[in-house]
Amino acid sequence: MSSKPLNYLTIGKTGQHELIIKKSKFICSLARTETVEEAQEFIEQISKKYHDATHNTYAYTLGLNDNQVKASDNGEPSGTAGIPELKALQLMKLKNVTAVVTRYFGSIKLGAGGLISAYSNSVTEAAQNIGVVKCVMQQLIKFSIPYTRIDEI
């Protein structure tokens, strides 16, 4: 028997959600991605869009068994941005999702705990606002039989 899940949770569509925490603006952009190339393309797209931001951090989880995961703090103190974003995706059991959180610094330092909370909450709230959907794995099976044998089915 296969160990692959028969269904999984992901986001319903690409979208964004914004939080303001102690004058810092956090914009979380989420996209459904199935390959590293798709994830990197989305990260680059958001980073270009918000090129003037203080940070564009990211995390992604790809594959139904989290086969490929990656996180980046993009200049924030180590472990305060990308990993909390990744953990938020994993706690919500989301698969094939890339999160990019853009931060515009608001002149008040948040400290390590504040950053961890802000980045994690950005992803969680974005997913809740954008919408989580359940994907059910299906396989289409086609077969043909002679009309004279239709009663045998």
Model segments located where?
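Helix N-cap motif at beta-to-alpha junctions
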Residues: T35-V36, P146-I150
